[in-house]
Regions:
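An interfacial alpha-helical scaffold signature
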Residues: 1-218
Length: 218
């Protein structure tokens, strides 16, 4: 009889803000073989916590890290560490938008506007409702704030969209690039990932993102 391989658990560092795997400015995610070491690291970086993975860093866990924006996974065991390059090929088949998720995480952590500017290369998901009666009309979902201002909703990927859509039926996800995003929300701005990062993209931030797109196309 062949030997049964027992999975070795791992502890993955998670972001308190996005509720997804934590990534640093170099787009690295971190997993540890020791819970204590993982907790110490999470406390050091701040606004992070630890999640135990009973099956270790399997394909599903690596897919989560990639979806959150990680390009590299760092696994640490005592004094030893290993690096794994993460690419969509070989991971769980799903919709990925890692560049935007990485820019969101890094902007929230650093407040450096360069990460907002980077978004001109990214895709966004917006909820849309189309009616053909009595004539065709297109409606985009919004969030109304206590001060009566409203912001359009947008999402980094289908996972974040699904969190919101579970309680909001009748909408369909539409993928747009930044020029489409700008046309929709240039007068009001966007609330990005309302069930996750809750990042407000103001009209000024939208203009900065759009400026990057125009300059790249020139």
């Amino acid at each position: 009889m062949g030997k049964t391989t027992v999975p070795v658990p791992a502890w993955l560092v998670m972001s308190d803000i996005t509720s997804r795997p934590y990534i640093d400015e170099s787009r690295q995610a971190y997993a540890f073989s020791s819970e204590d070491a993982a907790e110490e690291f999470a406390e050091k970086v701040g606004k992070a916590h630890v999640r135990v993975l009973d099956q270790g860093m399997d394909v599903g866990a690596m897919s989560e890290c990639y979806a959150a924006g990680a390009g590299t996974l760092i696994e640490l065991s005592g004094r030893h560490s290993s690096r794994h390059t993460l690419e969509a090929a070989g991971l769980a088949r799903r919709y990925y938008n890692p560049d935007l998720n990485a820019d969101v995480s890094r902007y929230i952590s650093t407040r450096r506007m360069e990460y907002i500017g980077n978004m001109h290369r990214c895709r966004f998901i917006v909820p849309v409702r189309i009616s053909n009666h009595p004539q065709m009309s297109v409606v985009y979902a919004t969030a109304v704030f206590p001060d009566a201002r409203f912001w359009y909703l947008a999402f980094t990927d289908l996972e974040e969209y699904g969190k919101w859509n579970a309680a909001n039926e009748g909408w369909a996800p539409l993928e747009v690039r930044v020029d489409g995003l700008y046309r929709i929300g240039r007068k009001h701005g966007f609330l990005l990932d309302p069930c996750g990062a809750r990042l407000l993209i103001s009209k000024g931030m939208l203009r900065k993102i759009m400026k990057g797109r125009v300059e790249e196309d020139a």
